[in-house]
Amino acid sequence: GNTDITDPRADQDKIRARIGVVFQQFNLFPHMSVLRNVTLAAIKVHHWSKDRAETRAMELLERIGMRDKASAYPDQLSGGQQQRVAIARALMTDPELLLLDEITSALDPMLVGEVLNMVAELKAQGTTILMATHEMSFAHEAADRIVLLRHGVIAENGTPAEVMDE
């Protein structure tokens, strides 16, 4: 929808509930299985039933190629797998917006493509994504709009062709 998040009358909690966030560190709970990591917020914050949350989580784990890892623990996964689990967790409640903050920066270079492919698939499926990244070739290929920052100030803003081809 069209929600002005700067409007003082806007319900900030409702806005936050419609946003999924993934950080550069995976932030998975080490003592919880993949399935529990993915379902925790849906059950505790959004008050979903365990059955509903687990059904949705298994759909997402299937989508990201991790269904067979549902009972695994984070230390049994590669960095790329952990990041995909973090993305699945962010997608649990079908957010309207997905914020991705340098999600490849903590990964082994061999795993970066795996995560970027997943982001490209999410975009192709219609997910709105705001992504902070240094992966400029990926941004050029996948973005509808690029905003370049220099020292915290917007230096360029436009389509990939406008920004990257200059």
Summary of predicted features, one role per range:
Residues 161-164:
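Short acidic-hydrophobic catalytic motif
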